Amino acid sequence: MSGNTFGALFTVTTFGESHGPAIGCVVDGCPPGMSLTEADIQPFLDKRKPGQSKYTTQRREEDKVQILSGVFDGKTTGAPIALLIQNTDQRSRDYEDIKNLFRPGHADFTYHYKYGHRDYRGGGRSSARETAARVAAGAIARLYLKRYLNLDIIGYLQQMGDLKLQFENENEINKNPFFCPNNKQTQELADYIDRLRRQGDSVGARVKILARGVPTGLGDPVFDKLDATLAYAMMSINAVKGVEIGAGFNAVEQLGSYHRDQMTAKGFLSNHAGGILGGIATGQPIEVSIALKPTSSITTPGQTINTEGEEVTVVTKGRHDPCVGIRAVPIAEAMMALVLMDHYLRHKAQCK
């Protein structure tokens, strides 16, 4: 199975399955000399880990990270950094009933027909459990970008189902279990999740990610555009079905006289481009929005087929998120960091 490595100079290779003994990653290309401990990485994993509130999956994982290599005396050596996260709360028995079935909307069908042999427990390699390794790797990138470039990345829930969230206060984002920038709407979100659980259903979401302090010039033309890499990175996240940069699809209805980001001696007058022109960073905040589908792991019975091609009814058991968009916030932040870190190293290698 290929497709497990991301990046050109700052590369991340993830490994492991949802119900295997552990997941992890190998980060290669991290510059030497950066202070790094497990305690530096852990807060980022704590934002993503399951079982923290009743509004997400009740699978409870500590997600304690171990640094196995690439760090000596508290500093990176330039060697590959291996990170390991133990799986401790698997309940594989929940999946016995569906080991020969294809859950609608999941990768069961495609993995089976591509590889002929799949790990059905919790989705195996296709599970969002894999993203914990991305968050751990992204933490290293974020720490470097913050310390050496003063670059900040922040993500938040922009919409859940038909409930649109008004951006009120950035400081409120990490003070509630929804990564909501408006504390006045958190009760609406809680009620929404409770209603979905009672109905045995799920809903999609929209997440926004901002990067501030991005140096002008990051990115390359044509095929390696910064926005092209960001779209590629975001689309690799489980359940993501759409990506917008800046104004995104709203640009369809905008006039050129409005959409163009006019410039003055003091800077740009708007940021409809989302901080990127010609695939290269303008120095403005980079703005990315992603759309996530509703998970198909629901208790409402549905039609499917089994490995013999016979029509059957399936009910998904196990512990799942009514809205996967909530925990997608730290994952999307991590992917933004990995892209920017990689492009920063590529920029340094080519330009002064």
Swiss-Prot record:
EC number(s) recorded for this UniProt protein: 4.2.3.5
Cofactor(s) needed: FMNH2
GO biological process: amino acid biosynthetic process; aromatic amino acid family biosynthetic process; chorismate biosynthetic process
InterPro entries: Chorismate_synth, Chorismate_synth_AroC_sf, Chorismate_synthase_CS
Record bears the keyword Flavoprotein: yes
Pfam families reported for this sequence: Chorismate_synt
Annotated pathway: Metabolic intermediate biosynthesis; chorismate biosynthesis; chorismate from D-erythrose 4-phosphate and phosphoenolpyruvate: step 7/7
Keyword Flavoprotein: yes
Residues bound to NADP(+): 48
Binding positions (FMN): 125-127, 238-239, 278, 293-297, 319
Keywords: Amino-acid biosynthesis, Aromatic amino acid biosynthesis, FAD, Flavoprotein, FMN, Lyase, NADP
A GO molecular-function annotation: FMN binding
Cofactor details (free text): Reduced FMN (FMNH(2)).
Class of this enzyme: lyase
Catalytic activity: 5-O-(1-carboxyvinyl)-3-phosphoshikimate = chorismate + phosphate
CDD domains: Chorismate_synthase
NCBIfam families (alphabetical): aroC (TIGR00033), PRK05382.1 (NF003793)
Family, as annotated: Belongs to the chorismate synthase family.
Record note on quaternary structure: Homotetramer.
Protein name in the entry: Chorismate synthase
Native source species: Legionella pneumophila (strain Paris)
